[in-house]
């Protein structure tokens, strides 16, 4: 029953890792510093959340709330950049935010 949530979390991890790597390889790393930082934070909290959800932890609900907030912050930042990897990351983060919020109600 948690598979759609786990899929969204894993897709977000992949998108954030790809975005951070692409930003680091771009010319102006300083301009992308907040994006890179949020990508790392988002990938990390998504990974931890996925592990807790997968094992049915009683603490998963707490992390789902925080994960949704970090996904929103990351999506908002990435959406400001025109790079394709940033736009794709913003979409994945928004989908993950929605999945986490849905998981809170389930």
Residue ranges and their predicted role:
Residues 1-106:
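Amphipathic alpha-helical hairpins
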């Amino acid at each position: 029953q948690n598979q759609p949530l786990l899929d969204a979390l894993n897709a977000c991890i992949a998108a954030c890792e790809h975005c951070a790597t692409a930003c680091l390889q771009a010319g102006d790393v300083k301009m992308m510093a907040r994006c890179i930082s949020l990508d790392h934070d988002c990938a990390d909290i998504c990974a931890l959340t996925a592990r807790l959800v997968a094992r049915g932890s009683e603490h998963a609900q707490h992390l789902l709330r925080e994960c949704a907030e970090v996904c929103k912050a990351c999506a908002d930042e990435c959406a400001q950049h025109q790079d394709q990897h940033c736009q794709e990351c913003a979409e994945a983060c928004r989908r993950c935010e929605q999945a986490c919020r849905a998981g809170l109600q389930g």
